[in-house]
């Protein structure tokens, strides 16, 4: 293959992705307008892998929007995707603790178990069984083209496993088992929703033309800003640059104090030239609702010490109510387990019904 041919292929893929994003953005805006008028007509599925504790990036990137959707009256579901932990990890150590801490943080942030079903992947076998018919609806080439699979494989440093390759199809099972028609996501996760739409469409066309079984879900594209870690890199638990929602005030202060800055005394907001200082300003701006540039102007020549002091005070003030609610909930872990057991029970009822509809459509009821 010549360099020119490779360049043409890269350009074609880029144009295809750009067109796909524009179509998804248009669909997202139209769906949001309908959702505002009739939230009861929408079912949302979202979730997290229990690979560690939730941090500020999770809150501003997704959890805040989940709470808002729930409170609007959208039928809300949150999956704790424990099976998906092993897509790029060789151990399930700490998974019990991680799962329970997710539920604690969800509820402390405002997720109401009476309005939102929280459940774990591994506890809903009928949902996972959908993977078999769904895999027949996609090609190997389509799976290999998924950019999220590529990036996850590169980040993990592992060989490509069958579970990682089929990760997007497993996510389609998560979304479609409860007939979710809206999925709040960031731009990076759009390919997962697109392949879910493809699977739903192909299943209905192949097996259920007269009575479609699955909706084609719309991605609700997040308007949340990308939140950098305290060192200016992407916020990640593995980098140790994240402010955990459940961290104490002292732990938070210690983390912020040791975050890197630069040699310039005057504080300015410049994410490209000064990523580390700008990351601290962005964090302060999010938790206070202020423009990071205004904060930088206010601190001025007072230097990095004054900036870190401001960030510590702002973050701790913002997280204080969350910590208080979390501590109160943590006094009764049996209740937290009951919430999860109840969610698992409800999810099984829904998944069993959906699987029966799938078997009926495929002529596999005996």
Model-based region annotation:
Residues 2-173, 327:
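N-terminal Rossmann-like or analogous alpha/beta NTP/dinucleotide-binding catalytic cores
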Residues 74-75, 140-144, 177-184, 285-295, ...:
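Short helix-capping/linker segments at secondary-structure and domain boundaries
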Residues 103, 110, 138-142, 180, ...:
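A generic secondary-structure signal for well-formed alpha-helical elements
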Residues 91-92, 183-186, 267:
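Short, polar/flexible loop-turn hinges at active-site or ligand-entry regions and domain interfaces
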Residues 191, 197-366:
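Conserved nucleotide- and phosphate/pyrophosphate-binding catalytic cores
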Residues 130-131, 163-173, 196, 273-280, ...:
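Short runs of predominantly hydrophobic/aromatic residues within well-ordered alpha helices
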Residues 145-203, 207:
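Internal, conserved structured core segments that host functional sites
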């Amino acid at each position: 293959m010549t360099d020119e041919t490779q360049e043409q292929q890269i350009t074609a893929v880029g144009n295809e992705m750009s067109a796909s994003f524009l179509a998804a953005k248009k669909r997202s805006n139209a769906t949001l307008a309908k959702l505002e008028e009739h939230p009861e007509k929408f079912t949302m599925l979202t979730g997290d892998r229990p690979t560690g504790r939730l941090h500020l990036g999770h809150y501003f990137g997704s959890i805040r929007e989940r709470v808002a959707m729930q409170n609007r009256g959208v039928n809300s579901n949150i999956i704790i995707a424990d099976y998906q932990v092993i897509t790029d990890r060789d151990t399930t150590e700490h998974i019990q603790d991680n799962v329970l801490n997710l539920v604690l943080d969800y509820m402390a942030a405002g997720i109401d178990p009476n309005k939102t079903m929280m459940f774990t992947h591994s506890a809903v076998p009928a949902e996972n069984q959908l993977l078999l018919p769904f895999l027949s609806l996609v090609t190997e080439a389509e799976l290999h083209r998924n950019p999220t699979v590529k990036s996850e494989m590169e980040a993990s440093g592992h060989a490509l496993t069958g579970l990682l390759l089929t990760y997007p199809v497993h996510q389609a099972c998560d979304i479609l088992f409860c007939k979710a028609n809206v999925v709040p996501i960031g731009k990076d996760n759009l390919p997962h929703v697109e392949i879910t739409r493809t699977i739903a469409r192909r299943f209905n066309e192949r097996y259920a033309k007269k009575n479609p079984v699955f909706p084609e879900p719309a991605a609700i594209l997040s308007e949340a800003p990308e939140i950098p870690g305290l060192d200016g890199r992407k916020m990640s638990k593995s980098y140790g640059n994240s402010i955990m929602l459940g961290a104490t005030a002292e732990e938070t202060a210690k983390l912020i104090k040791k975050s890197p800055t630069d040699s310039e005394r005057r504080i300015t907001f410049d994410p490209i030239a000064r990523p580390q200082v700008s990351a601290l300003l962005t964090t302060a701006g999010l938790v206070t609702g202020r423009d990071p540039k205004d904060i930088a102007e206010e601190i001025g020549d007072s230097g990095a010490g004054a900036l870190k002091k401001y960030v510590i005070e702002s973050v701790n003030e913002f997280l204080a109510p969350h910590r208080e609610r979390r501590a109160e909930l943590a006094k009764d872990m049996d209740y937290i387990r009951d919430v999860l057991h109840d969610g698992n029970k409800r999810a099984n009822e829904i998944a069993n019904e959906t699987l029966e509809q799938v078997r009926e459509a495929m002529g596999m009821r005996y």
